[in-house]
Amino acid sequence: MVVFKNIGHIITKALALGSSTVMMGGMLAGTTESPGEYLYQDGKRLKAYRGMGSIDAMQKTGTKGNASTSRYFSESDSVLVAQGVSGAVVDKGSIKKFIPYLYNGLQHSCQDIGCRSLTLLKENVQSGKVRFEFRTASAQLEGGVNNLHSYEKRLHN
């Protein structure tokens, strides 16, 4: 399973390589409409998060009839093995504000790659016009934010 940390990952790691859908549980966690209780820590509003493969999710309703244990074929296991985490994520507000960010992010990702649509992107990947390259951790660090004392990365307004 691939973990999507931002909208660019959805394009490059999934849709460009042939996926027609993506799982975005962690990305949508923290929205008003997602399950979980709110809490405050160090002045930040957070929302509890249980990844589907976490022990908390597997134990929540017992192992029988539980989507989490079913997904990981653990319904009859007496010992559960975590394949996810529980924690807290920063409050993202309503999904009504977050979905336009995702939509625009998909458009910008396609434009950055030089394609006007997902269909064209997939065609260009298959034909070799768009190719992927491996970047070392050093290259990724070098390509990041440089020469700033501090910065803030906001997903959307």
From Swiss-Prot:
Q: Which domain of life is it from?
A: Eukaryota
Look up the coiled coil feature and give its residue ranges. Answer: none
GO MF annotations in UniProt: IMP dehydrogenase activity
The cross-references to InterPro entries, in alphabetical order and at most eight, read: Aldolase_TIM, IMP_DH, IMP_DH_GMPRt
Q: Which BP terms in the Gene Ontology apply to this protein?
A: purine nucleotide biosynthetic process
The entry sums up its family as follows:
Belongs to the IMPDH/GMPR family.
The protein's name is: Putative inosine-5'-monophosphate dehydrogenase-like protein YAR075W
What high-level taxonomic lineage is stated for the organism?
A: Eukaryota, Fungi, Dikarya, Ascomycota, Saccharomycotina
